[in-house]
Amino acid sequence: MVAVFHGPLVLGALLLLLALQHGASAEEPGFANRTGVHVAFLTDCQMYSDWQSVGAAFSFKMSGQPGSVIRVMCCSEEQAKNYNKGLLGMVDTWVAPDATHSKRTGDRYAAYNKPEAVIDWLDHNVPKHDYVLVLDSDMVLRRPFFVENMGPRKGLAVGARYTYMIGVANELAVRHIPHVPPRNDTLAGPFGRRADQVGGFFFIHKDDLKAMSHDWLKFSEDVRVDDQAYRLSGDVYAIHPGDRPWISEMYGYAFGAANHNVWHKWDTFSMIYPGYEPREGIPKLMHYGLLFEIGKNYSFDKHWHYDFDVTVCPPWDLKDPKRRTHGIFPEPPRPSSLRKVFPKNGDMASMDDFIGYYKELLAIETLATLNAAFCDYHISHCPPSEQLVSVCKEVFSLYNEAREFIQEAEASYDCQDFHPKCEEWKESGECTKNENYMTENCRKTCDKCNKIEKFFPETTTKELEEKLAKMSKELQPLSEDPDNKAGAGSAPKTESPLVIPKQEQPVAIIPRNEVPPKQEVRASSPAMQSSPPPSPPPASPPPVDSPPPMSPPPESPSPDKPPPKVVTRKALADPKKVTQKALMVRCYKLSLGIDEVKDCVKAAKEGKEYEVPKRTKATDEEEEAPKAKHAESHLTLDGEGATTESANDEVAKTKAPDASAEGNEGKKNIRVVQRDLEDLSLTQGDGKKGKAPVIDAPVVGPSLHSLLGRLNTWQALVLWLVVVVAFLALVPRIAKLRRRQRSGMRTE
């Protein structure tokens, strides 16, 4: 009886579910049924490319792009063998051989890796989808590329506009592809061209890409060694005889495609550079290949970060507000700090203001996406730590705020016409005949603002934030332990107090008889660079005006002294039950320096509990001597906040002989550490940074500066009066001698 009614009930439920799904798809037409695209971003094995790859992979995940993604990476055998396993498994990856050195021409050129990567990938694999979107690793994908809207097909690809490729329509094209007839359209360049002026990204059918990939490499090599290319290519880096164009690879692609009858149509708005005004539409792709600024106090250039290592786990040194080598990039301004502006109908001034506001939001979103990508990687590959939790919470907060402001701005910007012929096309019925294109470019004229979805990707960092919350709970029991209260690593009151390492003790430098106001020493912003055309930069990074590195901590006591005693902290738990993970977490909770944390982690991996060294009395007395001498330095702050030392401080700092010292016969030279005067605290420096100069000061008695400092106001006034009177008494004699010299008299 039950079975009789069970079948119809299930069938009815299924029909109801299908009806609901059909209704949902009617409200959001075709989003789930879009054609999949295989996104391939091309890169190499350098550390400089690793952080870009992390950003590219994360941006694909957050863009809502239908399809799949692959990283095609060119590496030498040695590089591939030693490549970081965490980075290798981060995203689907194909490793191709390194091709920077051409076997055919003998030329060395890093961009040969782009065609070689595609050749090797397609020679051994078949893309999962019919259409491939080829990107560089220094791009952030922010909106999906839809085949139905952009219209690529076999024989016709889509690419960004690069009009400085003048060689497609001059003698350069004739020298390399004379058999290709001139074109009589302007879809991707001027009339009479023999190839298309495209670059940046390529939205192309997989069969076309495979067919022309070998010629992509061949023509890149040919243009590179063409002795006339310097005057025909339009490359601003190649203007003298013998110069080899940096954009040879772009010509290789254009000539290779034309040689296989693959042509393009321009897409003028899908890809822009941060800092450029998005006047032709809503960009889908941000290419951060050039220097850009946000407001007046923030700037970013990827070339400043050749040494950024995305694989380094906390602890991170994030003090430098301009340049960092690990962790996250300096945080951009928050969108809430900008003045909101929205366009008004018929008001061009308000539209200009809105474009400026939207431009700033896009730049902020680009940096926020990169930092969110780094946190995504660290959460999956680093042990729990309070710094990781606190830093990444702030990163995700900024990322979500940027997307919220972007979505609000683009809701207004979406209901616009981005082509001057929209009205004309509407009259000819194109709003119905060519609905996808008109929805993309003539939304307002065709009355599509509220009827067609705007394709803003509804992706969030909720899952990552949940992982952070779980990580924070794992750290909570440690923070409640009396030995590790709030993660500060403070010792229990019943035991001897923890000795704070010398390099972590702040030193306040106060001028005599004066309490200085609290001032912040900030690094200046990077120098503004002129923006070259959107072509790859030279291999070596440009100079960066970053602040000098902080000095290392004072040197350890000499070997002839007895080793310092150590104090062992109270065990967190039964030693037999302490796991390796708990030991590693303990390292990040203790109040240790960076080097000590590294030693602690190393000991934890071996299953040992790290012991914090305790300073002996003799060691503390010896370290107090250079500190006392350093406190006598007379520091001044100039108008820009930089600290300088007065001329009197050039006199060597000395210390009276210590007759009680053993083994030095009553004499002992104290090694005085001169610290970077821009650093007003004795903080621990990075081990990779340069050492501070050390001077052995001889024993010569009290310094002139210390003697003058003991005078009161009246004594100082009398001293200066004596100096002035003496100087005035010498003036007539000096004048008399000068008169004798001019009159030819002999002077002794």
Swiss-Prot record:
Its EC number is 2.4.1.-. Gene3D superfamilies: 1.10.10.1940. Glycans are attached at N33, N184, N297. Residues 27-710 are extracellular. It holds the Pfam family ShK. The keyword Disulfide bond applies. The chain crosses the membrane at residues 711-731. InterPro entries: HPAT-like (IPR056508), HPAT/SRGT1-like (IPR044845), ShKT_dom (IPR003582). It comes from the Eukaryota. Its cofactor is Mn(2+). It is an enzyme of class 2 (transferase). Disulfide bonds join C415-C449, C422-C442, C431-C446. Residues 474-576, 611-670 are annotated as: Disordered. Residues 611-637 have a biased composition (Basic and acidic residues). Glycosyltransferase involved in the O-galactosylation of several proteins including extensins. Catalyzes the transfer of alpha-galactosyl to Ser residues. Hydroxylation of proline residues adjacent to the serine acceptor is required for activity. Utilizes selectively UDP-galactose as a donor nucleotide sugar. This is Peptidyl serine alpha-galactosyltransferase. It comes from Chlamydomonas reinhardtii.
